[in-house]
Regions:
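An N-terminally biased module of ancient metal coordination in phosphate/nucleic-acid-related enzymes
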Residues: 1-72, 165-166, 184-185, 190-262
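Generic low-complexity, intrinsically disordered sequence content enriched
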Residues: 26, 115, 243-247, 271, ...
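Extended substrate/RNA-proximal surfaces in nucleic-acid metabolism proteins
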Residues: 52-212, 216, 275-297
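Conserved, well-ordered active-site substructure
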Residues: 265-277
């Protein structure tokens, strides 16, 4: 049996609703799935309800938080087994949502200066189309990218990011981020475990430097590291597994599925280059239960 501990829905920048994502996981034969939308837990209750209805599909409530890290790399931190009703999580989500809301109009304004005629109203409409029923609308760059496609400014979402919205794009603006320690503490305060997501995106070709970064994050309270990911080749996977053992981090893995926004990434399979065995989940769950027990003793 296989699992997927890194996926996204329409609650952030995925294209499947939380309900449809659970159905896709069931159809793919997965035994467990985590929903880890960017900076929000809005889709978790819907996903949990559908997973329970389907049966034989363990649901892990999660989140993915962007943390401050020097360019050109990026640091994302996954939270697993978080409490969707946590006040700490809600405060953090509100803070990051406000940061997104401040950035999005600047991006649209810059795009108009570059000749791409789209409006925030169009972007908001696209975000509403894709949001789960009753959930707060979280607007992100994928919604702006979709507006660019609909306005015939670009042919594809990928082209929108390459030309305008990615970190080297002409309309890119950085957003406010938590420090790594703040992100880890927020996840812990929400009852979850913190994991380094896709470590290759830290963008360091120096294994010694990568080890130093991972060590610092472990010392800051990190619980795990994503060993299996669609961006990891065999060499990277082996290196991350080695680092997990060296710094006593629980190895995790997932496809980073986004639906049609990443059409080459398949749920549970990545780019057909990964299978995360179900045996990965029990150690993560055991540490979560141990932490909960410690908190209540």
């Amino acid at each position: 049996m296989y699992i997927d501990l890194h996926t996204h829905s329409t609650a952030s920048d995925g294209t499947l609703t939380p309900t449809d994502l659970m159905r896709a996981a069931k159809a793919a034969g997965l035994s467990a799935i985590a929903l880890t939308d960017h900076d929000t837990g809005n889709g978790l209750k819907e996903a949990a309800a559908e997973a329970a209805r389907l049966g034989d599909l363990q649901f892990v409530p999660g989140i993915e938080i962007s943390a401050d890290y020097p360019a050109p790399g990026t640091l994302h931190i996954l939270g697993h087994f978080i409490d969707p009703d946590s006040p700490a999580l809600n405060r953090m989500s509100t803070l990051l949502l406000e940061a997104r809301n401040a950035r999005n109009p600047r991006i649209v304004e810059r795009l108009n200066e570059l000749g791409c005629r789209i409006t925030m109203e169009q972007v908001e409409g696209i975000a509403r189309e894709k949001a789960p029923p009753g959930a707060d609308v979280v607007i992100g760059r994928p919604h702006i990218a979709e507006a660019l496609v609909r306005a015939n400014c670009v042919a594809t979402i990928k082209q929108a990011f390459d030309a305008y919205l990615g970190t080297t794009g002409a309309a890119f603006f950085p957003k406010e981020r938590l420090t790594p320690r703040q992100a880890i503490e927020c996840i812990h305060d929400a009852g979850g475990l913190a994991t380094i997501a896709h470590p290759v995106q830290l963008k360091t070709d120096n294994p010694a430097h990568l080890a130093t970064v991972v060590n610092h994050l472990a010392e800051a309270g990190m619980d795990g590291i994503e060993v299996w990911h669609c961006d990891h080749d065999e060499r990277a996977t082996a290196l991350m597994l080695e680092l997990s053992k060296k710094y006593n981090l629980i190895p995790t893995g997932g496809s980073d599925f986004h639906g049609s926004h990443k059409p080459d990434v398949v749920l549970g399979r990545g780019r057909c280059n990964l299978r995360v065995p179900a045996s990965v989940l029990p150690p993560l769950e055991a540490k979560w239960k141990q932490r909960r027990h410690t908190e209540f003793v």
